Amino acid sequence: MSAEAEERFATLYGTTLRYTVQGEGSPVIVMHGWGCTAETVSSISRIAVNAGKRVYTVDFPGFGKSPEPAETWGVEEYTCLIESLAKHEQIEKPILVGHSFGGRVGIVYASRNKTDRMILIDAAGIKPKRTLSYYVKVYTFKASKRVLRLIYGEERSRQMIERRRCRAGSSDYASASPRMRMILSKVVNEDLRHLMPKVNAPTLLIWGTADTATPISDAKIMERLIPDAGLVAINGAGHYSFLDSPGIFEAAFTNFLKAQI
């Protein structure tokens, strides 16, 4: 974050949240993706500050300087935390900015709270349709767990299963603690399509066409389901479109922030 950012810690929703505050103007809450921190999205926060906004950038619990939740949270609990932050900071009708996992929280928040507008960047929220090979792997994996326990016992089988899971799973999963692995497994299986029609805030979708984590097809579904949504597709950019194509991203982001809605 920039030198002007003030670091704050608050006990909210039963946990400690670290976040930064900078700038003056209408409030913007910036939410990072899974495995990232407030620093990952610092360039987004800077753009919002330069557009004349007061920007709150969070470290979600389990990332950066915010400790892990004591329980296995889902998107609901992370959203309740952001609702608590808004109340704590006396933020009314914020502008929400969410990248990847942060987009999940933004969708849930905006579906039930007054929101000035929302920007979703390569956002998660659409549960992908699984291929037959996926289900074969899942059920083979579940069956193999039972066999391994019978042959090797509980402790050794647990270690073997964990190694296999890390090799087969996503890098996000492999690099996470046991608690955060359980949370990741929970949140990635949450489909938010049923909430999207309830989002009343004008919404800008900014997406990389080469995003393989949350493909552009997800953006098109969101554009269709969110009543007042528009899509800016950045050709050739990946899951971090704001880093891959910073110039195009900043132009689209700033124009939407400054637009009279």
Residue ranges of predicted features:
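Conserved HGGG/HGGXW glycine-rich cap/lid loop of the alpha/beta-hydrolase fold
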Residues: 20-65
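Flexible "cap/lid" loop of the alpha/beta hydrolase fold
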Residues: 104-111, 115-150
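Catalytic histidine neighborhood in serine/cysteine hydrolases
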Residues: 223-240
